[in-house]
Amino acid sequence: MPSHVEKAPEMSENNAWRSVHGLLGADTAARVAFLGVPLGRESITRGRCDLAPATLRAALKRMSVYDLETGTDLSNLAVFDAGEVGVAALTPAEAFAPIRDAARTQTQTRALTILAGGNNAITRPGVHALGLRKAGLITLDAHFDLRDTDGGLNNGNPIQALLEDGLEGAAVSQIGLAPFANTRKAHGKARRAGITVHTLADCATNGFVVLVESELERLSGFCEAIYVDFDIDVIDRAQMPAAPGARPGGIAVRDFLAAARVAGAHPKVKCVDLAEFDPGRDVGEIGALTAARWFAEVLAGFAARQ
């Protein structure tokens, strides 16, 4: 180029800026996929978790692709937009196969698939998409989700259903379990199954993110793939009013976001989900912006793999 030819100036950021939403597209070669799973039926607490995927998509327009704290720039990261699974009107039992199959299509061809629920019943088909014989599961959740299945599937028993399906308890780690939010029966089930249990007190003593890192390392020792379920009710209720099951004394949102980046960075994490965000209960867009930031943090972690 002749030295006298000037480069075109960058577009003014008063007119446009690059957002995380702009990373979503139809690039079939993308190593990351985004799949909306608007499952809301059979929630123990009534709400509108089915609205969460669309709300998250809209909030991604508020997230810049640049993290000034670490210098991470997501501008060159493509995310395949796999759309939404049509399960809003279905029960968890009816939605199982459609969610499993849609997630499997992505996990078989991508390094990381991000599922946006929906209630926590999306976790069971998500884990099945990886295959029970090779998968490890970490749940970041205030609850065991070990309610009995004799009354049918709901958002309070995906872990119980997975154990009944054949997932080994030793391949399950549950972090952030809250006092006075679970039953003795569920605790006993977890112990008998061999599930690794870390309470909120454990998180306060050892560090939430440290425990997530430790369990990722433990599971990676014998699992081919790891699924991480991010139930936002693990966050302190004061910081997450849009989570029907959140309790006072939960995890700080900063730690929840840090765990998202840690999970995104781990090479054996093949699928993550965000569950139990209810836009109908949101206050001042706290939940929407937290969900969008969570998505950005997962991508920032994944970018570190490369």
Where are these regions (language model features)?
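Conserved alpha-helical scaffold segments that buttress catalytic/binding sites
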Residues: P2-Q306
